């Protein structure tokens, strides 16, 4: 028995096949082509959209990196400005402290000088008062030279004990 035998069923199979091709071509070619074309257009549109989205994403990434770099630069500048300001304030505080110290020293020296001068004036007044008292005692007693010297020594001793 041969593998392919040519008989009347073979003939009908060929006719059925061509008839099926004709029916498929006549009734299904356009809808299938339309579906295939729509699918092809949809895939192409999605590919174009994906390419567009990829470019947008790359641009957004570049923009974000540029913004990050700008922010870092700005942050660095802010830190440097803050450091400069802190250094200036430190120098100003040191300068003010030195000026205050100098003012305090000058004020203290002036006060010491005033106290010293006041003490000298007070001492001068006391010496004048003591001299006046001594002169008064000398006049009251009308003493001779020897008594006057002993009276002065006695008065000086009394003044020394009081102090």
Curated annotation (Swiss-Prot):
Pfam families: ATP-synt_B. It is found in: Cell inner membrane. Its main location: membrane. It is a single-pass membrane protein. CDD domains: ATP-synt_Fo_b (cd06503). The keyword Protease does not apply. Keywords: ATP synthesis, Cell inner membrane, Cell membrane, CF(0), Hydrogen ion transport, Ion transport, Membrane, Transmembrane, Transmembrane helix, Transport. The chain crosses the membrane at residues 3-23. One of its GO terms (molecular function) is proton-transporting ATP synthase activity, rotational mechanism. One of its GO terms (cellular component) is proton-transporting ATP synthase complex. The keyword ATP-binding does not apply. F(1)F(0) ATP synthase produces ATP from ADP in the presence of a proton or sodium gradient. F-type ATPases consist of two structural domains, F(1) containing the extramembraneous catalytic core and F(0) containing the membrane proton channel, linked together by a central stalk and a peripheral stalk. During catalysis, ATP synthesis in the catalytic domain of F(1) is coupled via a rotary mechanism of the central stalk subunits to proton translocation. Component of the F(0) channel, it forms part of the peripheral stalk, linking F(1) to F(0). HAMAP family: ATP_synth_b_bprime. Belongs to the ATPase B chain family. F-type ATPases have 2 components, F(1) - the catalytic core - and F(0) - the membrane proton channel. F(1) has five subunits: alpha(3), beta(3), gamma(1), delta(1), epsilon(1). F(0) has three main subunits: a(1), b(2) and c(10-14). The alpha and beta chains form an alternating ring which encloses part of the gamma chain. F(1) is attached to F(0) by a central stalk formed by the gamma and epsilon chains, while a peripheral stalk is formed by the delta and b chains. This is ATP synthase subunit b. It comes from Fusobacterium nucleatum subsp. nucleatum (strain ATCC 25586 / DSM 15643 / BCRC 10681 / CIP 101130 / JCM 8532 / KCTC 2640 / LMG 13131 / VPI 4355). The lineage of its organism: Bacteria, Fusobacteriati, Fusobacteriota, Fusobacteriia, Fusobacteriales.
